[in-house]
């Protein structure tokens, strides 16, 4: 089986590789960094390293160099973000970041069925809404009723994106722009299809049809997670296991439940609490480049092959951590773009989530 670990930041023929993107700030755990051009490893004497925040040149004499590899260790938590330049080429637009934390980086969960590639699949639903959107309750109610029904109870994960009219709970990136949202409410399924509001009954029918369409195709990959949470730091080692050969990316969104705000309602009736907002996107960690949030590169995998990505996220002090959870999703290259092929939703706490097989 093919196994990809560490991190690669590649722009055309320039490549920076790091053995890991998260280390324990114990002075021993290390990230080993190499620079390549046209697939040839470069001498570090020929490469300039720049601080990604200040764009100042870094003095490599302050780092450990072993066998033409920069070995990065640290005794204080923080981030080391840099880009490199070689002749007229550089990686400034896509810097590399090494995060140091005050606890051990989690291991990948053990695979309970190494020979199995048949995974439980869930649809990723992104619901675009806002407190000032009077017709949003017609979609919110429909979504709630579909997802709590016996038939659809465990077939999807939901992220609420509050991007309407300068909403106080808008996420930290413009997902509405990335997904081409021009009307509210709007619901996107797996970064592919979308629906607008046509009234409660039609919304229920359309949500079901799109979930059914998504799940009519088997999952292209499974997801396992080893997660550690200490204070306001979250580190997750996410493993992607391919069910079929393909190119994959992986992303993570932090959500929060129990947020309050008066919801404008243009007439949706029923026993719903429209003023309590759940599954609200707080942080997006899936930016590939520009306005593309399809996930971090895992790469090409053969069926049964695995790839990893390490996520490091800071939980804002204003969030109620016990009300937070994380969606991890995998996208797969289809036609000319990436579409979600599986997703899971897990609480924010130290935990081990193995692959879920059918």
Where are the model-predicted features located?
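Single conserved hydrophobic/aromatic residue that forms the stacking wall/gate
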Residues: 1-6, 11
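Short, solvent-exposed loop/linker segments at the N-terminal edge
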Residues: 12-15, 19-29, 227-231
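Short tyrosine-centred short linear motifs in exposed loops/low-complexity segments
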Residues: 26, 74-82, 246
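Extracellular recognition modules
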Residues: 81-85, 327-329
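Short, solvent-exposed loop/turn segments at the edges of extracellular beta-sandwich modules
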Residues: 87-93, 334-335
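Local sequence-structure signature of Cys/Sec-based thiol-disulfide redox active-site neighborhoods
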Residues: 114-154
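Short, conserved sequence motifs used for protein processing/export or organelle targeting and
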Residues: 154-358
């Amino acid at each position: 089986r093919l196994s990809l670990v560490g991190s690669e930041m590649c722009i055309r023929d320039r490549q920076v590789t790091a053995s890991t993107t998260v280390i324990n700030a114990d002075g021993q755990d290390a990230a080993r960094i190499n620079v390549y051009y046209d697939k040839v490893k470069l001498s570090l004497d020929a490469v300039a390293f720049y601080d990604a925040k200040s764009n100042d040149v870094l003095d490599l004499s302050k780092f450990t160099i072993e066998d033409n590899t920069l070995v990065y260790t640290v005794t204080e938590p923080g981030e080391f973000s840099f880009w490199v330049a070689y002749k007229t080429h550089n990686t400034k637009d896509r810097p590399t970041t090494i995060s140091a934390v005050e606890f051990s980086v989690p291991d990948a969960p053990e695979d309970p069925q190494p020979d199995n590639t048949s995974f439980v699949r869930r649809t990723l639903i992104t619901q675009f809404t806002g407190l000032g959107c009077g017709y949003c309750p017609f979609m919110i109610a429909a979504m709630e009723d579909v997802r709590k029904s016996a038939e659809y109870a465990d077939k999807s994960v939901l992220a609420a994106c509050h991007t309407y009219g300068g909403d106080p709970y808008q996420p930290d990136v413009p997902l509405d722009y990335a997904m081409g949202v021009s009307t509210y409410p709007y619901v996107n399924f797996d970064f592919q299809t979308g629906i607008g509001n046509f009234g409660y009954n039609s919304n229920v029918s359309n949500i079901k049809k799109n979930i059914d369409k998504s799940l009519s195709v088997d999952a292209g990959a499974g997801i396992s997670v080893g997660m550690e949470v200490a204070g306001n730091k979250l580190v997750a080692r996410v493993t992607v296991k391919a069910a079929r050969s393909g190119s994959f990316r992986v992303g993570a969104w932090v959500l929060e439940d129990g947020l309050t705000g008066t919801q404008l309602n243009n007439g949706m009736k029923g026993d719903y609490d429209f003023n309590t907002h759940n599954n609200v996107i707080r942080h997006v960690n899936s930016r590939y480049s520009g306005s593309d949030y399809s996930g971090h590169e895992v790469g090409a995998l053969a069926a049964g092959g695995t790839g990893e990505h390490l996520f490091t996220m800071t939980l804002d002090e204003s969030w109620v951590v016990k009300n937070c959870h994380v969606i991890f999703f995998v996208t797969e290259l289809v036609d000319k773009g990436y579409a979600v092929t599986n997703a899971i939703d897990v609480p924010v706490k130290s935990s081990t989530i193995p692959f879920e097989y059918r």
